[in-house]
Every structure is written in structure tokens, then in C-alpha cells.
């Protein structure tokens, strides 16, 4: 009994449309949608920035390190043979 029925919501919607007009309501809806989209984009940009900068040091290339380690091994193999 204390809740708002569907008919009451429809009457309120008609009154709002009559007061503001459809163009103004469409503009308000578009502004609200772009604000929500901007907020979501800012949140995702912040999360991706946190994921990119995870460590305090510069990453090293494994290829250079493997090449340095491979060179002494070949010399050892030649000496043993």
C-alpha cells in the first residue's frame, strides 16, 4: 500500500516531460552518459598505469644475458674436447 505504483510513475514521467521538454531531457541524458563514460575511462586508465609500472627497476633483456652465458660455455666445451 505504501509503495509507488506503475500508474503513479507514469504520471510523474508525463509531468517531467511537460515541464522540461524532450530536447532538454535528451540533452541531460546525453550529458549524464558522457560523464559516466569519462569516469569509466579514467578509472581504466588509472588501473592500466598501475599495472604497467609494477617494479622500481628497469627490466633487463634475457637475450643479452643468454648470449653472455653461451660464449664461455663454448670455450669450456672446446677445452674439454
UniProtKB/Swiss-Prot annotation:
GO terms for cellular component: TAT protein transport complex
Q: Which UniProt keywords apply?
A: Cell inner membrane, Cell membrane, Membrane, Protein transport, Translocation, Transmembrane, Transmembrane helix, Transport
UniProt-annotated stretches for the region Disordered? 42-81
Looking up InterPro entries in the UniProt record yields: TatA/B/E, TatA/E
GO BP term, pick one: protein transport by the Tat complex
Coarse class of the protein's main subcellular location = membrane
Q: Which GO terms describe its molecular function?
A: protein transmembrane transporter activity
Q: Where is the signal peptide?
A: none
Cellular localization per UniProt: Cell inner membrane
Instruction: Report the membrane topology from the UniProt record.
Output: Single-pass membrane protein
Show the stretches that span the lipid bilayer.
1-21
Q: How does it assemble?
A: The Tat system comprises two distinct complexes: a TatABC complex, containing multiple copies of TatA, TatB and TatC subunits, and a separate TatA complex, containing only TatA subunits. Substrates initially bind to the TatABC complex, which probably triggers association of the separate TatA complex to form the active translocon.
Q: Which HAMAP family match?
A: TatA_E
Q: What does this chain do?
A: Part of the twin-arginine translocation (Tat) system that transports large folded proteins containing a characteristic twin-arginine motif in their signal peptide across membranes. TatA could form the protein-conducting channel of the Tat system.
Put simply, this protein is called Sec-independent protein translocase protein TatA
The record lists the lineage as: Bacteria, Pseudomonadati, Pseudomonadota, Gammaproteobacteria, Vibrionales
